[in-house]
């Protein structure tokens, strides 16, 4: 029986759609999939039904199955159908119909009609309430769509779907993680699988649903991958659903099941029984082609998960047959051929073993399977074992031969171990399979003996052999024909029978005598067995034993040397026992007499085939010698096969034997031995002419013969091809090689190619050319059997061959020309028209292909070359251009390859001593460069020209113009590494050749090159400029080229500035600085001097027409610079000097980059002890020249440019102004340049160079700038420069009187000395410092402010250094400085006022730091300066104040602060001064110690009262004063904290008397209200900080505050702010009372009356503060009943009807606050309050009534815990 809760839930569910009231019905009706609730609520069923019917009709057109619902769910009668009044059976039928509809509609939710049709079911049948599970299940796979979100918004989620609850009202759809959580619930999983089962039964599955289901199942498995318990729970569910999916006819269902099974088995390895059952289920219903691949993949992966023993056993018979019926051999092999096939060795092993057990007809596919899969060792072992067992029962064992050959090829040891484990040996197994298998040649002699001579022969055995003989009687041979000539197939059958007979235990002699009736046939058969690779080793040994027997039966007169060649071939056998047996037979033959009657001499190798034999004596001698030298351990017998004596005879003999012997194996052996003979020559190869010539025709028969005899056909052909010997003279042999290359046989072609490569170098040139041409011709055939290009590139070709082959494949024949005139090739339209013909076009393409292949080969060889080859290549370049321009063929690759070959050839010629070339076609190169559209080709051609430059300077002279014009226009604009390297290399090679051949015009050529390159500078990629131009400058010689280059760049810099391209100008400066990095400092200085010389030339041309004409012909000035107007020229000169300034100045970046810093580069040379003295002298000379040049321009700037303007007579008068401006600017820039130049030298050199100029120079500007530079020169110098600094200081001190008339020089001298004193300080001589201080104190009184400022700065630094030693100058420093400050305050027009005040402040700061005790007397003056230096930034003044606080006695500071406030600050109306004063005071208070604070407390409180009175005398606005007072309160609170009660209490009393009585008031203008306001603000702040510590201090205030409160009541005192402050002070005191101070009856009675009576006229704005105060008083006294009664009575007095509304309102609020805080203490007083409350509830003022009802009454009820109405009743 279900629980009560379950029963209630069921009742609720049944009644979910029953609506008993209107709201409930409206809510049910408004639930909609389409409309919002408001719209849905207004719709009737007829409207909804009409829309749904139309939608259903549309769905029926898509899926006819929907039509059935038009008679049920969508019938007219359904409009009036109410499911709440239906019977159970009717409801069940309705639910079934709805479920069927939802199943069918599940795949159509992406269609709008589905939504509209389902809307009817929601609105009429409430499926979102009654059929929730089916609705959710059928739409769950749409969980990320808006449709599902809409369903969630109207549905009531069943318990199993609670995971979706977070998304019911969310804008976001459910996530994939939500689905995992949902499916991870076992109950839900069972529900969903049940639903899926219904879908499968009704064929309602679809791809999207299956994809969703599969993904969810997979995610659940992955989610629980580490939870074996949960995975085991999933086993029955997933297997069940997989089985149902597999039972479906749908291929999608089956593929889904496959996926689920694979993933699940991977996560949790299943038992083999389950996997076999799954495999059977997978196969049972498998028909669709697409599903078959998935099924096979699944089966393989399932088997791969198996672990432990028996995982690769044979499949059960039933499953194997089922699998066999579904998958044919081709499909399995196709599956295994795919690159993405899975690891499937376990299944393939099981399947292979199953074939061996159940279906032997398919043994032939096992090998194909094994070759396509990699098996584990144990798997291979099991298959081998199965096949060995199978060999025992299989009649036709030939099926197993290939399998075991494969196994032996991959692991012979494993096969032998398997045989051994089954009690077999390799020899016996070979006999069983009737073929040779193993390479291991060591056989067991006992086995051979056992096989050769069975122990005893019974009648039964005889009968059995007779039966065997009768069965194979067709193979009996009764003729004396040699078995060596027998066909391969017949021999193979006889060999198999022989092996089988031996294996069955029959005697070998019985078999031989029965199947071969003649001695000849027996012996030749046994010989063939001996040399047959197909024969087992044991059988060969048996054969050798029988040969020995049969030889003895041959007559003595017969010479059996004819058998020797075959036996010699048998010596190649791997088995030493076989070779030993052969040697024994050879010994028997050697013992026989040598007669002329040779055994089978005309039949052994075929009927009527006469074998040329040796002379009997020679044969006897040869055999004897061979046996003496032969050792059985030796495989290689080539050395002893042809003895030196009669070598030619023996070579001829063996050559004939190799030609005539029919066995391919024997032929291979003999040919190998012949080819190894060092004396074998091509003369012997003539024997093979007929055989070789017809070999290709007979190749297929030889191939079959090799296969039948198990002879390696590749080895056979290699031996044959190796007959082509080095220095081959026979043309038929060369033809054979070429025929082999051109044949369709890939193996033969490759062997021929290898042989050709090895002997090519030994052939004559005609043969080489023939071969190369053949290969080139073959290369045009895309179906060649060998790698034509690879072979051609592997041949050792020389330059003559290349020249010949290139000429043979050339379309122009200009090599015979001797007159290489420098002309351009001309083309006619006829050549273009010719190329339009298809035949000609095809020939051209073929020609291009051949040419490309030849060039590739040449490019790979590299180490060949000759002048003839070079000219040929250049000629071909012209051919390619023709093919490109006229034929339109793709010659780009061929051109690049040809150029590469040309470069290699030139390099080769240089390396091999070639120094000069003549008649080089330069026009071809230039034409190719200009006409090519490929930057790569152009670049490589430039490299060719560069390489030719040293070999043919004539080419350069005739081509330099087009070459460099082209480079400037194209190459240097390319942004790639290769092009850059090309241009650099061209420069490095071409420029020297150009200069070498310039013949006196070197400068002109150099300037032409520089102009060409700099013109294209803007087009060169920025990151490649430095490398390119650095290469150019270095190649041209920086000493000669740098000045001209800088001038050209200066022009571009000026142009950029004129056109406002500031970015470009900056880039040019960076470029030049980076360029100068790679140059030596001497070269850099020389370049700058050359630049100044060029500028001098240019300026002189403006004053002399003759000089101008002489410069017009110079390339450097050919760009219009000589034709500038006056203004343009002045601008250019200004910008040029600015350019020089920029490249010589030292920036922050240069400071950190040693390579860019000119000064450091000079230092590194001058200070390096290893530097060459000549170099140092050159640098000094160059520097002197540079300094001289700059000074020349400075001294002559006005004269120079006035001469220029005098030539311009037509200029307007404003040009004079322009000239003046330009001259001033140029002069300023020149002085900057001078400073840069002077900084270049080390300090000692610099000082020696500059100091004399200060005395000798008459130009004031020069002296000014020189002095200015001195100051900056020492910035980076260390203490080692002290002697130099002393010297400089002395000179400057001496110069000062002389420069007194010049303000700027005086100022700069003082500033320089200031900088030096600041840097070197105490290290300077004391006398110099004293002189400097004396000078400075004198100059303080100067009339010029600039000098005053500089003097003050020098004094400051000197005082810093001298300290107390400067005390003698104190009267000359401090008083004058104060006077200066006061004078500056009065002087409002001085533009340097700020700087002067800063200088004074800094001076005082220095004095404070160094001599603070001496400054005490003037500390007031110092503060005066600080507070009133209005021009100085506040941060500076605050810093000086900090110094005062740190260094001056704070007691004295506090006294001075009181004085200065009273005398100056208070009356100044300067907010900044007041602010700085307060900052000083604050810092003083913070830093003063408690003892000092206590001793100075009277002064501080005097100052405090003065600050309180500031309000009455200040003209500041109220907000400003309030901020000042707030700061004062903070400071005073900090001060109070440093005092004890004993000291502070009397001072507090003084404050109280000052506030209430006016005692001690210094300013009569301050009112009582202002005093009280100041006091209470201070007191309230004090209470916040000290809290209960000063509660008792209220004693001094009690009566005055009581009187003040009464004055507020009587309105004698009216100030809302003051009233608020007083009330707040009481509140704070009450709040912080910890000592029951306010519980004293006397204090309580005194203050309670006056405080409560404030209710009578309290202002609304501060009423809340009064309420808080009364509440605090009540709370403080809550434990004293008498006080509670008094307070209650006092408050009630103000709640009576006679009181004003405002009074009653605040009284009510006070009472409410009291009851909310301490209501329980006041409950006893409630009876007194009830009548008052009752009266107030009937008050005419609604606000009062509301406040009582909603406020006071509610609070009282909370305290009482019961309604207040009872008390009222």
UniProtKB/Swiss-Prot annotation:
Q: Give me the segments passing through the membrane.
A: none
| UniProt KW keywords | Acetylation, Mitochondrion, Nucleus, Ribonucleoprotein, Ribosome biogenesis, rRNA processing, Transcription
PTM annotation (N-acetylserine): residues: 2
Q: Where in the cell is it found?
A: Nucleus, Nucleolus; Mitochondrion
Q: Which PROSITE patterns match?
A: HEAT_REPEAT (PS50077)
| Gene Ontology molecular function terms on file | snoRNA binding; U3 snoRNA binding
Please give the Pfam families that the UniProt record associates with this protein: BP28CT (PF08146), HEAT_HEATR1 (PF23243), U3snoRNP10 (PF12397)
Q: Name one GO cellular component term.
A: 90S preribosome
Question: Quick check: keyword Nucleus in the entry?
Answer: yes
A biological process (GO) of this protein is: endonucleolytic cleavage to generate mature 5'-end of SSU-rRNA from (SSU-rRNA, 5.8S rRNA, LSU-rRNA)
- Where does the record place its HEAT repeats? 1729-1767
Which SUPFAM superfamilies does the entry link to? Answer: ARM repeat (SSF48371)
Primary site of residence: nucleus
Miscellaneous section: Present with 18200 molecules/cell in log phase SD medium.
The UniProt family comment states: Belongs to the HEATR1/UTP10 family.
Function according to Swiss-Prot or TrEMBL: Involved in nucleolar processing of pre-18S ribosomal RNA. Required for optimal pre-ribosomal RNA transcription by RNA polymerase I together with a subset of U3 proteins required for transcription (t-UTPs). Involved in ribosome biosynthesis.
The name on file for this protein is U3 small nucleolar RNA-associated protein 10
Q: Which organism is it from?
A: Saccharomyces cerevisiae (strain ATCC 204508 / S288c)
């Amino acid at each position: 029986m279900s629980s009560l809760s379950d029963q209630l839930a069921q009742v609720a569910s049944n009644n979910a759609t029953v609506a008993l009231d209107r709201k409930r019905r409206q809510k049910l009706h408004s639930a909609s999939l389409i409309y919002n609730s408001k719209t849905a609520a207004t719709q009737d069923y007829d409207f909804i039904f009409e829309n749904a019917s139309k939608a259903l009709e549309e769905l029926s057109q898509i899926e006819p199955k929907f039509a059935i619902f038009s008679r049920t769910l969508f019938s007219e009668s359904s409009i009036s159908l109410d499911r709440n009044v239906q019977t159970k059976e009717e409801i069940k039928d309705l639910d079934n119909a709805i479920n069927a509809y939802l199943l069918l509609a599940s795949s159509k939710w992406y269609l709008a009609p589905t939504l509209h049709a389902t809307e009817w079911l929601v609105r009429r049948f409430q499926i979102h309430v009654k059929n929730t599970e089916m609705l959710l299940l059928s739409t769950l796979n749409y969980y990320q769509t808006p449709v599902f979100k809409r369903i969630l918004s109207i549905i009531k989620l069943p318990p199993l779907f609670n995971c979706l609850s977070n998304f019911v009202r969310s804008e976001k759809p459910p996530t994939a993680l939500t689905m995992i959580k949902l499916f991870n619930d076992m109950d839900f999983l069972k529900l969903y699988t049940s639903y899926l089962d219904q879908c499968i039964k009704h064929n309602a599955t679809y791809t999207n649903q299956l994809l969703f289901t599969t993904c969810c199942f997979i995610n659940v498995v992955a989610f629980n991958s580490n939870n074996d318990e949960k995975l085991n729970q999933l086993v029955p569910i997933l297997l069940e659903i997989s089985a149902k999916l597999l039972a479906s006819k749908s291929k999608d269902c089956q593929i889904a099941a496959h996926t689920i099974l694979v993933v699940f088995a991977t996560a949790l390895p299943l038992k083999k029984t389950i996997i076999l059952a799954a495999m059977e289920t997978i196969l049972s219903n498998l028909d669709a082609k697409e599903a078959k691949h998935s099924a096979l993949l699944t089966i393989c992966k399932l088997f791969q998960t198996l672990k432990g023993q028996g995982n690769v056993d044979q499949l059960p018979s039933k499953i194997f047959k089922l699998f066999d019926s579904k998958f044919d051999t081709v499909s399995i092999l196709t599956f295994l051929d795919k690159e993405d096939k899975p690891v499937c060795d376990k299944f393939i092993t099981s399947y292979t073993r199953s074939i061996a057990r159940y279906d032997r007809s398919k043994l032939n596919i096992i090998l194909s399977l094994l070759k396509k899969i990699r098996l584990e060792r144990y798997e291979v072992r099991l298959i081998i074992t199965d096949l060995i067992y199978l060999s025992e029962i299989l009649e036709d064992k030939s099926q197993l031969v290939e399998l075991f050959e494969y196994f032996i090829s991959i692991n012979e040891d494993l096969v032998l171990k398997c045989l051994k484990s089954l009690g077999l040996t390799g020899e016996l197994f070979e006999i069983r399979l009737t073929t040779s298998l193993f390479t291991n040649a060591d056989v067991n002699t006992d086995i051979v003996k056992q096989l050769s001579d069975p122990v005893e022969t019974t009648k039964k055995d005889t009968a059995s052999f007779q039966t065997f003989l009768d069965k194979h009687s067709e193979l009996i041979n009764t003729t004396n024909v040699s078995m060596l000539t027998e066909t391969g197939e017949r021999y193979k059958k006889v060999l198999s029978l022989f092996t089988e007979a031996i294996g069955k235990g029959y005697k070998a002699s019985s078999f031989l005598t029965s199947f071969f009736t003649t001695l000849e046939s027996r012996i030749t058969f046994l010989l063939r067995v001996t040399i047959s690779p197909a024969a087992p080793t044991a059988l060969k040994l048996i054969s050798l034993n029988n040969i020995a027997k049969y030889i003895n039966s041959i007559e003595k007169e017969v010479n059996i040397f004819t058998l020797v060649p075959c036996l010699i071939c048998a010596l190649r056998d791997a088995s030493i026992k076989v070779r030993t047996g052969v040697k024994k037979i050879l010994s028997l033959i050697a013992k026989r007499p040598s007669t002329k009657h040779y055994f089978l001499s005309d039949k052994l190798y075929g009927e009527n085939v006469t074998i040329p034999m040796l002379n009997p004596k020679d044969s006897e001698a040869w055999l004897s010698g061979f046996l003496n030298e032969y050792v059985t351990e030796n495989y290689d017998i080539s050395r002893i096969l042809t003895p030196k004596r009669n070598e030619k005879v023996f070579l001829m003999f063996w050559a004939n034997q190799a030609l005539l012997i029919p066995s391919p194996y024997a032929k291979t052996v003999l040919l190998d031995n012949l080819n190894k003979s060092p004396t074998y020559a091509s003369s012997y190869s003539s024997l093979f002419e007929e055989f070789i010539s017809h070999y290709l025709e007979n190749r297929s028969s030889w191939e079959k013969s090799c296969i039948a005899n198990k002879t390696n056909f590749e080895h056979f052909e290699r031996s044959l091809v190796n007959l082509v010997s080095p220095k081959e003279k026979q043309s038929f042999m060369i033809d054979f090689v070429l025929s082999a290359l051109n044949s369709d046989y890939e193996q033969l072609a490759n062997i021929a190619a290898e042989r050709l490569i090895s002997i090519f170098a030994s052939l004559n040139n005609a043969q080489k050319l023939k071969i190369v041409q053949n290969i080139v011709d073959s290369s045009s055939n895309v179906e060649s059997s060998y790698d034509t290009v690879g072979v051609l590139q592997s041949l050792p070709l020389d330059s003559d061959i290349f020249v010949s082959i290139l000429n043979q494949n050339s379309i122009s024949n200009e090599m015979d020309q001797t007159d290489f005139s420098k002309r351009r090739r001309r083309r006619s339209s006829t050549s273009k028209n010719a190329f339009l013909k298809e035949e000609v076009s095809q020939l051209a393409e073929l020609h291009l292909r051949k040419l490309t292949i030849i060039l590739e080969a040449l490019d790979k060889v590299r180490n060949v070359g000759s002048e003839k080859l070079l000219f040929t290549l250049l000629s071909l370049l012209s051919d390619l251009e023709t093919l490109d321009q006229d034929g339109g063929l793709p010659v780009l690759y061929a051109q690049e390859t040809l150029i590469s070959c040309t470069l290699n050839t030139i390099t080769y010629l240089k390396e091999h001593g070639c120094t000069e070339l003549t008649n080089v076609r330069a026009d071809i190169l230039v034409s190719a460069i200009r006409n090519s559209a490929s930057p790569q080709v152009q670049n490589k051609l430039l490299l060719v020209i560069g390489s030719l430059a040293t070999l043919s300077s004539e080419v350069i002279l005739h081509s330099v113009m087009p070459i460099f014009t082209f480079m400037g226009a194209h190459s240097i604009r390319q942004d790639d590494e290769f092009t850059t390297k090309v241009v650099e290399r061209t420069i490095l090679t071409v420029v020297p050749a150009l200069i070498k051949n310039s013949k006196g015009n070197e400068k002109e050529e150099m300037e032409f090159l520089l102009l060409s390159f700099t013109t294209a500078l803007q087009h060169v990629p920025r990151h490649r400029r430095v490398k390119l131009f650095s290469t150019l400058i270095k190649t041209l010689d920086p000493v000669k080229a740098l000045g001209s280059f800088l001038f050209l760049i200066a022009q571009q810099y000026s142009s950029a500035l004129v056109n406002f391209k500031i970015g470009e100008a900056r880039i040019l400066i960076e470029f030049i600085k980076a360029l100068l990095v790679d140059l030596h400092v001497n070269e850099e200085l020389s370049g700058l001097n050359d630049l100044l010389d060029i500028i001098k030339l240019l300026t002189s041309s403006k004053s002399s027409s003759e000089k101008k004409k002489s410069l017009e012909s110079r390339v450097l000035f050919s760009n219009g610079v000589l034709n500038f107007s006056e203004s343009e020229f002045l601008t250019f000169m200004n910008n040029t000097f600015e350019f020089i300034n920029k490249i010589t100045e030292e920036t922050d970046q240069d400071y950190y980059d040693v390579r860019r810093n000119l000064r450091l580069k000079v230092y590194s040379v001058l200070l390096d002890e290893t530097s060459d003295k000549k170099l140092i002298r050159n640098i000094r000379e160059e520097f002197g020249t540079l300094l001289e040049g700059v000074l020349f321009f400075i001294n002559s700037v006005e004269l120079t440019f006035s001469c220029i303007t005098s030539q311009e007579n037509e200029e307007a008068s404003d040009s004079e102004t322009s000239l003046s401006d330009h001259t001033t600017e140029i002069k300023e820039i020149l002085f900057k340049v001078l400073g840069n130049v002077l900084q270049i030298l080390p300090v000692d050199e610099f000082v020696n160079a500059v100091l004399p100029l200060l005395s000798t120079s008459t130009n004031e500007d020069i002296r000014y700038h020189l002095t200015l530079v001195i100051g900056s020169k020492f910035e980076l110098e260390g203490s080692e420069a002290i002697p130099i600094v002393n010297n400089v200081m002395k000179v400057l001190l001496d110069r000062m009187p002389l420069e007194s008339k010049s303000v700027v020089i005086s100022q700069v001298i003082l500033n320089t000395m200031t900088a030096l004193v600041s840097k070197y300080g105490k290290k300077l001589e004391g006398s110099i410092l004293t002189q400097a201080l004396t000078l400075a104190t004198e100059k303080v009184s100067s009339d010029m402010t600039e000098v005053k400022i500089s003097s003050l700065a020098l004094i400051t630094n000197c005082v810093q250094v001298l300290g107390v030693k400067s005390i003698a100058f104190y009267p000359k420093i401090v008083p004058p400085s104060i006077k200066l400050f006061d004078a500056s305050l009065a002087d409002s027009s001085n533009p340097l006022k700020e700087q002067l005040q800063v200088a004074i402040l800094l001076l005082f700061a220095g004095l404070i730091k160094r001599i603070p005790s001496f400054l005490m007397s003037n500390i007031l003056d110092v503060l005066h300066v600080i507070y009133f230096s209005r021009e100085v930034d506040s941060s500076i003044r605050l810093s000086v104040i900090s110094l005062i606080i740190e260094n001056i006695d704070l007691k004295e500071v506090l006294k001075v602060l009181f004085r200065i406030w009273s005398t100056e600050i208070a009356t100044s109306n300067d907010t900044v001064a007041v602010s700085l004063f307060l900052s000083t005071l604050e810092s003083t208070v913070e830093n003063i110690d408690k003892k000092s604070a206590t001793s100075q407390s009277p002064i501080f409180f005097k100052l405090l009262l003065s600050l309180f009175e500031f309000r009455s005398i200040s003209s500041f606005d109220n907000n400003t004063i309030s901020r000042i007072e707030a700061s004062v309160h903070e400071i005073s609170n900090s001060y109070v904290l440093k005092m004890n009660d004993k000291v502070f209490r009397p001072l507090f009393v003084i404050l109280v008397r000052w506030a209430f009585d006016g005692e001690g008031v210094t300013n009569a203008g301050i009112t009582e209200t202002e005093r009280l306001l100041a006091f209470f603000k201070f007191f309230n702040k004090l209470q916040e900080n000290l809290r209960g510590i000063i509660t008792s201090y209220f004693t001094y205030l009690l009566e005055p505050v009581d009187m003040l409160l009464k004055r507020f009541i009587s309105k004698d005192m009216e100030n809302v702010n003051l009233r608020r402050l007083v009330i707040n002070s009481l509140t704070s005191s009450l709040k912080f009372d910890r000592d029951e101070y306010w519980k004293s009856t006397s204090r309580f009675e005194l203050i309670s009356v006056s405080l409560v009576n404030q209710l009578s006229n309290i202002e609304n704005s501060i009423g809340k503060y009064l309420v808080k105060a009364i509440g605090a008083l009540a709370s403080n006294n809550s434990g004293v009943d008498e006080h509670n009664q008094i307070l209650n009575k006092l408050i009630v007095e103000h709640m009576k009807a006679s009181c004003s509304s405002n009074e009653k309102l605040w009284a009510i609020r006070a009472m409410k606050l009291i009851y909310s805080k301490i209501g329980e203490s006041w409950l006893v007083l409630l009876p007194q309050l009830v009548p008052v409350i009752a009266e107030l509830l009937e008050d005419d003022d609604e606000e009062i009534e509301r406040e009582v009802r909603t406020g006071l009454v509610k609070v009282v009820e909370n305290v009482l815990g019961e309604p207040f109405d009872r008390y009222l009743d």
